[in-house]
Structures are given as structure tokens and as C-alpha cells.
Amino acid sequence: MTASSRGSSAATASREHIGYENGVLGGVSSAVQALTAPGEKILVHSPTYVGFTHTMADNGRVLVHSPLVRDENGVWRMDYADMDAKLKRHHIHLAILCSPHNPCGRVWERWELERAMEVYAANDCLVISDEIWSDIIMPGHKHIPTQSVSADARERTMAFYAPSKTFSLAGLIGSYHIIYNTYLRDRVVRQSEVSHYNDCNVLSLHALLGAYSPAGEEWADEMCRVIDANHEYACNFIRDNFKGVRVMRPEGTYMLYLDCADWCRKHGVTIRELQERG
């Protein structure tokens, strides 16, 4: 892999560590079913990708949210004390980490991931790391695979990737996991097999190979530069024309996360009403 290996831990993986999934959400669902029981709680950061919300509800699991917080520079950060408290209070042993984070666009720095993994390890919590956005990284930032930050993280984490976001291949179906821990890998693979849907198709396989070629990497690099310019334009436009709406320029992904709380207070509307007007 070329385009993928710059953003994933594939460069250090052997053949047996990599497995096919029809989609990242499908792989996440298989891991959740393999490692938890209905009614168990799973830790996620909020704001939360709506796909996690729906998938966990469909599987009968309960999400516990640890809200991201802004630092003094307006950068969204994980709240490690809150994570630790909720893992302990709710006896949680499985967490989902979105890296880069959707929807706020954070590309977690190594120290942030190291500290998060220390919290998970201290609470005997396994980690599902959704890294589907790892190739859409803006200039000046670098994706750090969760599994790369420590020996414990390598064994504790199940990482999921796909070319679908980067190369608009979602309609063809196809993603993959990287799981180094043999026990965890066997559990996830077995759960994926019993679903009877997790079979690779030839068209998506060749699309992935084409995407993860030198030409695909060149295309992805150019796309990231275009997205970065679009981010700059959009953020400037929002700040100039929508007073009270806060926006942080994304470090990764093509998502813009708008904080409309001040705007809503000023105009006497709720977030729900604003969504309905949209």
C-alpha cells in the first residue's frame, strides 16, 4: 500500500494482521458484538459520528459520551479526567476512538493519543480505532496511527480503515481492519464470518488496489491541498458573515464543525429549531 500506508499502521503489519470488512461501520459492529453483550456501555467522544450512534443502538449497546473540551486556544481536546471517571463509574471495557475525529476535524497529536491509551489501559478498556479519515490530512499535520503509540496500544487496539472517504468509493463497498492481537483478531473475524455478508468482491478489490497506488497517492495529496483551500475560504466566510458562529479550521477530514451556541442564544432559537430551519 502507498496512499494508505502513510496514514495507517499497514507499513508494520503482516498479512495475517489485515482482514477484509465490507465497511468500517460493519467492522466496528462486528467488534462490538464479539467483545460486548447487549446492554453493555461503550465510551465515545462527543460530538459523536451519527453512524456510531445508530449502529450501537441497533446492536443494543449503550453509548456513554465523554465531551471534547476547548482549550485556551479554542482547540478541541479530549478530557482525560472525564474519560477516566466514566470508564470507572460505568464499568466500561470497550471504547470507540475516532482518529482523525469526525465531526470536529481534529488530527490527534501523538501525546494526546499516548495519554488516551494510558487511560484506557489503566481501566482495562479495549479500543476500536476508526481511522477511515487518515488519508485526508491538511498540510502541517500528521496522522498518528493509534496502534503505533505504544506496545500496549498495539495489542489493545483494533483499527479500521477504508479508501471510501478519500477516493469516493463507498458505493463499491470494502474496507479492512488491522488487528495485531491474535485473540482479538480471531474474535472479530469469527463475528464477521457469521454475518454471512462479509465477502470481498472483485470490483472493490481492484478499486482499492488502484487507489493505494503511487498515482492514487499523488491524487490524494492534490485533493488535500484543494480541501485545505476550501477550508480557508469557508472558515473566513463564516467568521465574516455569521457573527456568533464559531468554527475551527479542520486539521483533517473535509468536515466543518460549527459551534452555533452563541448565535442561537442571540437569536432566541434552539439548536433543534436551527436544524429544522436548515
Region locations from a protein language model:
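PLP-dependent class I/II
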Residues: 2, 6-278
